[in-house]
């Protein structure tokens, strides 16, 4: 079975288009309405500033609506020039500028100009680093604005909206040409004020922070704008198709179209317990799929033409092939399609398959595989794993059921192993069916499953209970993580001082009766551990506002007494973010509006891929409580009666991970003669160790030597091809002595027959000395979507800081809604709000049930579910026939082990939180040392026993010094099992022995040191098995 490979949310491993690549088919657009002119960019800047500082969401809508109406009245009905600047992240025509904060800083230093030792030059280059004097640190556009304002002589900007769009078009067209882009940016510098440049830089960085969501902009622009965008992912088409606010789309216009990118359906976040997922299926048999972590991809085919694009609408046809004579995939899959197909759209995941090792390679190799034009049979290649059929022979299948679509999918495609395959799927009926499949996935180092209701329809850009992710249940969390909204914060002290260090989080209160009021949020939990230094830099750059106890935020409901949920500062929901949190349990508390809080909470990640609409609701909190109480009642009633047997199983040893035996590898060339290498494996890749061995063999075969250890004074070249920085590699990087090179340098050198130049593109991390080398700087620029290097892995700091105390005074509830302007009469007209004209907004769907149809195409759904016999003569909804039938999972009833009482985390019942200064307090660790393994009847590897024993002695001291407890394998409160990477042969057995009542985290010993270095509890995923 093919295994999934890790994939970042924004597809950083995916390649970017270059000038040499062929132009893609130009989309057809309706004739745009003609404007009578444009407007000064300054009036749009005034709108940005009003939106960014306005507290009330309804007032922001009215401001936006007033501005749109004035444009239509004075300039015309073509709002595309404005929408491109309001929603730069949605502008496909300017997908890439090739300019990030670092490049912009260097460019501005030259064009101002500033000396490299000038304090402002240093400030621009080090904009992320917080200082006591520099309150705007972490917000690059604001830092730039302050630097420019000291030197710019422009009092009034002269750029118009059309001129700015032309300038931005020129910057995008000249991506990678720094000299040309610098000249274009000089036009901006010479013709706009410092404040205007601040907003232009926000547009270039595609990070506006104007407190207005994309859905709000679309809803104000036109009632059908969001529906149309979901079907085409094309801002220009939305602007020109819907220029008339009074014209409504018909149902056909909201369907997907061949060769038009659409916003795919997504999975709902996992439920707290697997039983809840089963319940959400409404008693139906359901479909179980393994969750694949490749790159989400849609494939369109019409006749002999193909079109590929990502979840975000990025066109990858140039990579995979527009026709059978082009690309790295199309020539090999054309024969897989049934000859009766005229046109078809498939949804699936793009992976990288290695025919030699018969497994998937790390996601970072997708670019190399996709660009490979050699067509050699044994080279790694893209493989498309299909899980849905959405369009067939002119008919949209969005309103058909999953079962129907899958049944017909198997009659449309004949799988070609390693090229195009179906996602493996099983039928389930009980929670035990899911757990059985989860056990298989976990043993294969997978990360989860997707459960689908067989009658689910396909909802564009939708996320409901018809598709649910399932992840394993762990001892130190409630069975799953939750996504909560950060609403407020408290300042830290001591080593955590200098800004916000504790975050107050809330859930959306969906218990309130339906009304036109803005959503309210109920305080729920405080988080003080789990985030890294880079995360805190990003968090502190947010536009925090001072908390006024006499006038607290209207959207936030807090406890009547107590101070736990009262912050020093707060964030408006539109400026906030979702935090992924795990905790031991939910417990009663009168310190939060919910009446409950989380015990031992800690942050796992900032979910910048989620919107505030993905926030956990109050109803979901109470559902979690109900299911937990039910579980306890069942335990007390003795439903789980069978105790686990203590029979010890002997397990087979896994291959050694010290490196391959190179004695039998013949040396064929002297390409790497005299060069020494240390190869690191990718901990996120299931084939990491195997990939490492193959690379070491390649090095040896070409004259190089390999070592296992990086010595301080060694001149060894470090090789690493992952996307994260494992702890042991971080230690090497921190020394500042060694470069870290990507494996592509090895393969390219072998191809060239000599060592390839050390260009920037080959570096995962470069030392400061290397960065000044001519060879290193030969590259024209970085590619969009490239896997981030170690130097770039700190979170990109978001902009939009509002200094405490800088906001305008809160408005009285009875204040008239008309906005008072101190500007001239013309500007006043742009922002004049008319209460009688409030844009209609689509209603929010509250019901996620499969019985409630929330499809955009509900108005055209047939009363009966026809099959596609008219097109294809295939089977319909029957369960039995042929290729459309699902493999049936075993449904035998499994018994669960008895648990002596309700085991709770913590040293006492009263303990509620982690201690940020004693990070392992309340956690219990089992060390998989050779002595412990032998005592429990498990085999060990004698070769490493002494070294591993000594290492575990040091790990034990670190754990104890930081508040943790060392326990035995059968300790009920056990939370972590620590292994040494030199001998992980007992991983599967330890996983089985510690999986009840919930799984324990299996981590490498490096995880302990990484936590101590960061001063917080890190997410175990990076160092787990």
UniProtKB/Swiss-Prot annotation:
Composition bias type Acidic residues, residue spans: 775-785, 806-816, 845-870
Stretches for region Disordered: 1-36, 773-904
Record flagged with keyword RNA-binding: no
Positions annotated as active site in the UniProt record: 291
Subcellular location: Nucleus
Catalytic reaction(s) noted: ATP + (deoxyribonucleotide)n-3'-hydroxyl + 5'-phospho-(deoxyribonucleotide)m = (deoxyribonucleotide)n+m + AMP + diphosphate
Binding positions (Mg(2+) 1): 349
CDD domains assigned: Adenylation_DNA_ligase_IV (cd07903), BRCT_BRC1_like_rpt1 (cd18435), BRCT_DNA_ligase_IV_rpt1 (cd17722), OBF_DNA_ligase_IV (cd07968)
PANTHER family for this protein: DNA LIGASE 4 (PTHR45997:SF1)
Function: DNA ligase involved in DNA non-homologous end joining (NHEJ); required for double-strand break (DSB) repair.
Protein name in the entry: DNA ligase 4
Lineage start: Eukaryota, Fungi, Dikarya, Basidiomycota, Agaricomycotina
């Amino acid at each position: 079975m093919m295994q999934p490979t890790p994939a970042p949310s924004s597809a950083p491993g995916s390649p970017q288009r270059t000038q040499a690549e062929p132009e893609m088919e130009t989309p057809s657009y309706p004739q745009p309405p003609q404007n009578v002119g444009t407007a000064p960019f300054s009036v749009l800047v005034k709108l940005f500033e009003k939106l960014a500082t306005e507290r009330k969401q309804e007032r922001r809508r009215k401001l936006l609506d007033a501005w749109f109406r004035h444009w239509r009245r004075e300039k015309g009905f073509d709002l595309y020039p404005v929408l491109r600047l309001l929603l730069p992240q949605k502008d496909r025509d300017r997908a890439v500028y090739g300019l990030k904060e670092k490049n912009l800083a260097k460019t501005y230093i030259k064009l101002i100009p500033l000396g490299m030792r000038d304090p402002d030059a240093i400030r621009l280059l080090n904009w992320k680093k917080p200082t006591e004097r520099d309150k705007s640190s972490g917000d690059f556009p604001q830092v730039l604005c302050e630097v420019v304002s000291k030197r710019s002589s422009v009092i009034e900007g002269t750029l118009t909206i059309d001129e700015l769009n032309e300038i931005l078009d020129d910057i995008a067209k000249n991506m990678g040409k720094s000299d040309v882009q610098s000249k274009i940016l000089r036009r901006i510098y010479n013709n706009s004020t410092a404040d205007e440049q601040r907003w232009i830089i926000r547009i270039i960085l595609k990070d506006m922070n104007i407190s207005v969501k994309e859905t709000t902009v679309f809803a104000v622009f036109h009632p059908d704008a969001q529906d149309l965008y979901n079907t085409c992912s094309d801002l220009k088409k939305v602007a020109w198709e819907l220029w008339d606010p009074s014209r409504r789309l018909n149902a056909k216009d909201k369907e997907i179209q061949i060769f038009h990118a659409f916003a795919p359906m997504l999975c709902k976040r996992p439920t707290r317990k697997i039983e809840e997922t089963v319940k959400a299926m409404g008693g139906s048999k359901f479909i179980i799929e393994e969750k694949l972590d490749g790159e989400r991809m849609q494939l369109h085919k019409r006749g002999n033409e193909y079109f590929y694009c990502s979840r975000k609408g990025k066109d990858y046809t140039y990579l995979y092939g527009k026709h059978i004579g082009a690309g790295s995939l199309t020539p090999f899959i054309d024969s897989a399609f049934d000859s009766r197909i005229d046109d078809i759209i498939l949804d699936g995941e793009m992976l990288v398959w290695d025919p030699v090792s018969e497994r998937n390679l790390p996601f970072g190799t997708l670019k190399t595989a996709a660009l490979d034009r050699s067509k050699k049979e044994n080279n790694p290649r893209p493989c498309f794993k299909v899980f849905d059929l959405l369009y067939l022979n002119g008919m949209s299948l969005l309103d058909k059921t999953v079962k129907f679509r899958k049944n017909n999918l198997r009659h449309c495609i004949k799988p070609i192993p390693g090229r195009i395959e179906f996602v493996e799927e099983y039928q389930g009926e009980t929670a035990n069916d899911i757990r059985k499949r989860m056990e298989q996935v976990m043993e294969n180092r997978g990360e989860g499953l997707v459960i689908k209701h067989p009658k689910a329809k396909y909802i564009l850009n939708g996320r409901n209970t018809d598709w649910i992710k399932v992840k394993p249940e762990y001892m130190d969390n409630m069975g799953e993580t939750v996504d909560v909204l950060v609403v407020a914060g408290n300042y830290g002290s001591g080593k955590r001082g200098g800004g916000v260090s504790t975050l107050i989080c809330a859930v959306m209160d969906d218990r309130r009766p339906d009304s036109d009021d803005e959503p309210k949020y109920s305080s729920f939990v405080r988080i003080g551990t789990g985030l890294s230094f880079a995360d805190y830099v990003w968090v502190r750059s947010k536009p925090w506002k001072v908390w006024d106890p006499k006038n607290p935020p209207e959207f936030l409901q807090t406890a009547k007494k107590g101070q736990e949920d009262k912050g020093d500062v707060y964030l408006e929901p539109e400026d906030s973010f979702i935090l992924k949190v795990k905790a031991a349990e939910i417990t009663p508390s009168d310190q939060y509006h919910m009446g409950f809080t989380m015990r031992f909470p800690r942050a796992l990640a900032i979910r910048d891929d989620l919107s505030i609409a993905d926030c956990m609701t109050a109803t979901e909190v109470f559902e979690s409580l109900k299911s937990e109480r039910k579980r306890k009642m069942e335990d007390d009633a003795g439903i789980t009666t069978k105790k686990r047997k203590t029979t010890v199983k002997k397990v087979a040893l896994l291959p050694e991970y010290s490196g391959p035996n190179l004695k039998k590898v013949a040396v064929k060339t002297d390409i790497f003669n005299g060069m020494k290498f240390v190869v690191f494996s990718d901990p996120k890749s299931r084939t990491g160790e195997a990939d490492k061995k193959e690379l070491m063999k390649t090095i040896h075969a070409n004259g190089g030597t390999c070592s296992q250890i990086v010595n301080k004074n060694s001149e060894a070249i470090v090789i690493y091809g992952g996307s994260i920085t494992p702890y042991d590699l971080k230690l090497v990087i921190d020394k500042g002595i060694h470069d870290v090179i990507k494996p592509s340098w090895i393969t390219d050198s072998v191809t060239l027959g000599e060592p390839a130049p050390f260009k920037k593109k080959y570096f995962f991390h470069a030392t400061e000395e290397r960065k000044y080398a001519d060879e290193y700087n030969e590259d024209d620029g970085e590619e969009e979507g490239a896997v981030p290097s170690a130097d770039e892995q700190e979170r990109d700091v978001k902009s939009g800081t509002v200094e405490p105390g800088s906001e305008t005074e809160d408005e009285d509830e009875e204040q008239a809604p008309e906005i008072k302007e101190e500007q001239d009469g013309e500007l006043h007209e742009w922002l004049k709000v008319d209460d009688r004209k409030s844009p209609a907004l689509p209603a929010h769907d509250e019901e996620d049930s499969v019985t409630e149809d929330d499809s955009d195409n509900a108005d055209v759904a047939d009363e009966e579910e026809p099959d596609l016999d008219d097109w294809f003569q295939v089977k319909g909804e029957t369960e039995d026939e042929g290729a459309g039938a699902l493999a049936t999972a075993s449904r035998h009833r499994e018994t669960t082990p008895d648990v002596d009482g309700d085991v709770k985390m913590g040293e006492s019942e009263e303990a509620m939180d982690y201690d940020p200064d004693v990070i392992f307090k309340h956690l219990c660790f089992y060390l998989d040392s050779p002595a412990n393994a032998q005592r429990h009847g498990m085999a060990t590897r004698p070769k490493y026993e002494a070294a591993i024993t000594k290492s575990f002695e040091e790990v034990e001291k670190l754990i104890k010094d930081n508040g943790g407890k060392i326990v035995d394998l059968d300790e009920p409160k056990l939370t972590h099992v620590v292994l040494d990477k030199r001998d992980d042969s007992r991983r599967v057995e330890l996983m089985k022995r510690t999986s009840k009542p919930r799984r324990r985290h299996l981590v490498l010993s490096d995880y302990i040191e990484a936590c101590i270095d960061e001063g917080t509890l890190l997410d175990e995923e990076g160092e787990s098995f």
